[in-house]
Amino acid sequence: MSGWRRLLEEESEHQWLSFTVFSIIVIIGAVLIDWSSDLSGVHDGSTLDVDGIVMDSAGDSILYQSDDGIRITHDDNENTAQYATCLEEYSGMTLACLGNEGMLGFIGDGSDDCDDTWCQFSIGENLTATQVSGNGLAILMVVQDGTSDALAAIWFGESNPEPMVSDHEGNLHLDVMLPTEDGWLVGGSWQAPANWLGSNPTSPPMYELVIHVTWDGVNAPAIEIVHMGNEGSIHGLFTTDDGYIATGTSDTISIIDGEISSLGISSYAAIGDNNGDVWLFGGIGSNTVAIISGAEISIERLPEPLKILPSYVTCDEDGMIAIHGTDNTDNPSAMSIDSNARQSFTSLRGILDLSFILVSILIFSIMGWNIYEAIRKGEVF
């Protein structure tokens, strides 16, 4: 104890020890914190264990592209679904766009026949659904209409449905749907007609599109254009505390009380986590991930450049984000991110930040004790 006291007394006279140690701690801490600023919880692989490229998932079902074609799994059952395009959770069961004209697939309804086996119900004649979304008892579907898409609506449970199909101008390609309080937001792209404003007649440009759809149950679904952006396509729609977020390959927009704001972020895929944040992923070689949290946008650095061209992203009930796509050799690839690790106290960044604070408090306490002792003894310091 006498040695420690002599060291403190010597330090109180010269103040060299605290300043030296504190300077070293600041330098080392800055280096370590910068090193630890990479996004935490990133690792290879996915919670969706299939041998192929995941196209969609819902509940216990996974739709994926394998070497043998498109397949769909549900628990331990696996089936060929060569023309399937979508999966959607609805009222405790899973709906599937299986590519069969006039029919939608479903599983997990609790009945003896269809709880573990895919069944189908009618959606009307001459319609093939590629996307589906339920809102209450109303079912909205994206259906094929020649080379374009249209929207059709039916009541769930109708024995002989007579779907109402929307009438619209232009060539629509619709990929995502999100139920709202009074209808749906639908996103995708609008394709310009041939020779539109001097464009290439063989490959007219496609522009990001968000539309609002309402249905009164009697007439065809009503369409209102919410946003038409630059060349690209909307691939994600998400609910936030204040409104909605639409993510696209050209831009990301927020929709709050009917007001549209550009966020200036492009992405290949996006997902909303369990904390209400929206994660946006770029293409192969991207070094960062953009995360929208309310009105704030943070850019997180990945531990290494992205090795995947993302095509599908999901987030499970534990907050684990799985990114699926292809690598630079066009082989299936996946990676996962723990969305809760970014702000976790036990993350490397959190531990280093806490350690830096504790060491700083210790050093300042020693300096304060020395100042107190010097004042008590009437010494000049």
Regions of interest found by a model, annotated:
Residues 2-23, 29-381:
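Residue-level hotspots at or immediately adjacent to binding/recognition sites across diverse folds
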